[in-house]
Amino acid sequence: MKRFALAVVTLVVCAGAQAASEEVEMNLVTSQGVGQSIGTVKITETDKGLEFAPDLKALPPGEHGFHVHAKGSCQPAMKEGKPSAAEAAGGHLDPHNSGKHEGPEGMGHLGDLPVLVVNND
């Protein structure tokens, strides 16, 4: 999976009980802070769980990690003595404290979502 130092997309879901859907703005982030908007992700409650519908622009073609993080901040924070992009978002959402990070294809914690694939067009 390709990694992008200048563009890390993180997602935090804070949906109210009465809300059937929520639209969340997505921004590019760097170790200096939150940057330009690149679109939205619409999150809808369905009978099978949450559905994530990204409407994003300006991402390079290829695979991108797609995650739900534990905290509602995409600000930089210190990691190993250096500013790190979106570190304030915390780890991936793991409300059951499974401690399992098995990636998008595994049966890990709830914060791991399928890989987001961006086509050339």
Enumerate the language-model features and the residues they cover:
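N-terminal leader/targeting pre-sequences
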Residues: 4, 9, 18-121
